[in-house]
UniProtKB/Swiss-Prot annotation:
Note on domains (UniProt): The N-terminal domain is essential for RNAP assembly and basal transcription, whereas the C-terminal domain is involved in interaction with transcriptional regulators and with upstream promoter elements.
UniProt superkingdom: Bacteria
Membrane-spanning segments: none
One of the GO biological process terms: DNA-templated transcription
Any single Gene Ontology cellular-component annotation: DNA-directed RNA polymerase complex
Signal peptide: none
NCBIfam families referenced in this protein's UniProt entry, alphabetically: PRK05182.1-2, PRK05182.2-5, rpoA
Annotated protein name in UniProt: DNA-directed RNA polymerase subunit alpha
Top-level EC class as recorded in UniProt: transferase
Encoding gene, per UniProt annotation: rpoA
Molecular-function annotations in GO: DNA binding; DNA-directed RNA polymerase activity; protein dimerization activity
UniProt region (Alpha C-terminal domain (alpha-CTD)), positions on chain: 250-330
Annotated disulfide bonds: none
Reactions listed under catalytic activity: RNA(n) + a ribonucleoside 5'-triphosphate = RNA(n+1) + diphosphate
Amino acid sequence: MQGSVTEFLKPRLVDIEQISSTHAKVTLEPLERGFGHTLGNALRRILLSSMPGCAVTEVEIEGVLHEYSTKEGVQEDILEILLNLKGLAVRVAEGKDEVFITLNKSGSGPVVAGDITHDGDVEIANPEHVICHLTDDNAEIAMRIKVERGRGYVPASARIHTEEDERPIGRLLVDATYSPVDKIAYAVEAARVEQRTDLDKLVIDMETNGTLEPEEAIRRAATILAEQLDAFVDLRDVRVPEEKEEKPEFDPILLRPVDDLELTVRSANCLKAEAIHYIGDLVQRTEVELLKTPNLGKKSLTEIKDVLASRGLSLGMRLENWPPASIAED
């Protein structure tokens, strides 16, 4: 029993009922009241949608150009064959993200997963799975199948746009169901510890496709859940700070020399005599100040005002922190 009223009970693995090699019931108890549904629903969702595995993603069938066709001597049409290939349970050695396997069969009778030719890195978990039927002794079928590692469910339509430019005619895409879990359900029953009768017992009933044992699937799902919850333990901000683009302190045009204004020689010389070297120096002067400049009359003043106006500037502007360090150093 827990040491204090604030201490949570921790579940322990009570029973694993192995119904078959692909079907098992796992029971966990005791759980605090309400935790049966909390944990059961979280594990169920992960097991259904987020478990990694391997699946058929592409197939090339000799003599077939598209999925809306049939093949002579084969009972099923191509769409049915693709649907049957989705049910292929394949285990690929760790470290390999994709492999190719081949199928060549002739003669009347069913074509099953066990007829597939593959190397030691591939294992077919359901060799009796039917892919199609050949209808006569002269019928034959040959195909090259691509198996990839992934997670969850990825429909063929989601890969069409990304692979359209590279996919040759005759290479057929297959909806990929990577999850090794076929069925998953959970039930919450009453549990008791000493005098407490308000506890939960979680019973997980699961079937896999044979590429992963049910017990191992639950372990992996629990690991995924724990890793996702780690971020909530200390709630640190792990966002990478965005690099803000530094805006220039002054408009670049203000840093250009007054010579760039292409004033008349008379006006330019008058400004240089007053130590007005940059446009930023000029725009801070007023009309009155410029008219006090020797040899600079109203005609030159009008010229300066017009040239500045054409660049969106004017006399009498106030520039804080002028001059900038780059100019001051010069």
